[in-house]
Amino acid sequence: MHRRLSFAVLLGLIIVLPLVAGGEKKLVLKVLVPEADAEIIVNGKTIEGEGTERKIEVEAAAKGQKVHIVTASWEPNNYTKFTRTRKVPIDSKGPVTVDLTKAYDTEKIKIRYVPTPDDVVAKMCQLGKVTKKDTVYDIGCGDGRMVIHAVEKFAAKRGVGIDLDEVRIKESKENAKKHKVEEKVEFRVGDALDIKDLSDASVVLLYMGDDVNLRLRPILQKTLKPGSRIVSHRFLMGDWKPQRTETFTGDDGDEYSIHLWVIGKKRKD
């Protein structure tokens, strides 16, 4: 009798255990990314694979975890790295589509630092017709050379440089002191995508990449005053065509292009 009971209990365990083990289903995510070679990280783990649409099975959530965190990073060019993150609730019923092809407020863009040669900076200031009446902004200012040059060589009234990298901002401030223009320039840490108002600027200098220029475009068009000038080294702004483009050979023998946009009169709706 005892042996029969033990066998029955054992048989019950054999039947129940697979049900328990198989009862915890993995969540299936369909992740959409803008680039086939984008890196995808789910809950801190890199997921191998390629393609703009990927099917990913998510492991069971850790204790206390309320969301699955899905991050994608990619580099559309040698200058720019995009990172986008989405959160998927733990109790979601799969499959869940995670669309990382669209930009949201959580998007981060990192620009590789490549300084603009001094002679190109001078050409940009000339194209933008910088004068003593101007307040010049450089978004993604790096070592600060653009606004320093605008103030020192073109007598701009004021210069403002913004960069995400604290090290570059520190370097910019040191360079301003070396050139003895620290009283006329301001450098601050900031994300280009967080800028909401550029109405203080009369000239904006850029070397940021096509993607970032395109995201800045609505702010530039909406907040800059009529007559304000935008000068971009190399990169454009989608279908907003520049009024003028200059191509020239730099002191280093390389060819450079700079583009000018002038803000027109605002329409009254």
Language-model features and meaning:
Residues 201-215:
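A short SAM/SAH-binding and catalytic strip from SAM-dependent methyltransferases
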Residues 169-200:
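S-adenosyl-L-methionine
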Residues 145-156:
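Conserved SAM-binding loop of SAM-dependent methyltransferases across substrates and taxa
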Residues 211-269:
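C-terminal substrate-binding/active-site "lid" region of AdoMet-derived donor-dependent transferases
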Residues 21-110, 115-119, 127-128:
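Short loop/turn and low-complexity linker motifs enriched in small/turn-promoting residues
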Residues 158-163:
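Conserved SAM-binding motif I beta-strand of class I
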Residues 126-132, 196-197:
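Glycine-rich helix-loop-beta junction characteristic of Rossmann-like nucleotide cofactor-binding loops
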Residues 133-142:
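Conserved class I S-adenosyl-L-methionine
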